[in-house]
Amino acid sequence: MLSLLGLLLAFTFSMSASRFEARKQVVLQDANAIGTTFLRTQLLSTAGQTIQAQGLLRSYVATRLQIYAAPAGSPAQKAAAVQMQALQHDLWDLVATDSRQHPNAVSTALLLTSLNEMIDLSETQVTIFANHVPEDILLLLLIMSTITVAMVAFLNGKGGKHQRLFTIILAATIALTIFIVLDLDRPQRGLIRVGVGSVERAQAMIESKR
């Protein structure tokens, strides 16, 4: 029973850790896409369009940070998501208008490409952050853990202090492992969170270009 529980714990921890790493990667990609799009706004046809696009991107990166900071599914996160979509729409309209006016401009095509990637990554981030370890697996893990600890406690119940201590340590170790699995699987709450330093650095870069 202990061996089976160990395999299940290892499998679940691996699932949780891989999802955590995927979330870290999408945050980095998000920051890179925002930074690239900002730099390419200088390729717009007029200085006025560049200033307008950069202003929208300043608001956009601030909104992205609000989405990362807010608890998943909270009213604050939903409001920030609505604002983000409006900013994406405004940015796309601005760049698309310039592209229609200058259909042969390679520079505008480059900006459209990076803007499209930035918008796509915002949706990818939502999908990856919502991709949790299946609840059925977590439920099975909890049931298996409870049964295993109960069996060990029963078998060691008539033993001495050393056997009771072993049972306590085993239960604590299993509980701690499950806690870490759950914490890794919830990136916007708990103790272990996905860092957004790369997005903050992108924001600092954008603000420095005023």
Each language-model region and where it sits:
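Transmembrane signal-anchor/signal-peptide helices with a preference for the extracytoplasmic
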Residues: 9-28, 185
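Membrane-embedded or membrane-proximal helical elements that form or frame transporter/channel pores
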Residues: 1-9
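Short, contiguous, pocket-lining structural segments
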Residues: 22-26, 79, 83, 110, ...
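Structured inter-helical modules in multipass membrane proteins
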Residues: 37-130
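Short extracytoplasmic/periplasmic juxtamembrane "stem" segments immediately C-terminal to an N-terminal membrane anchor
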Residues: 27-44, 195-209
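Alpha-helical transmembrane anchor segments
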Residues: 127-210
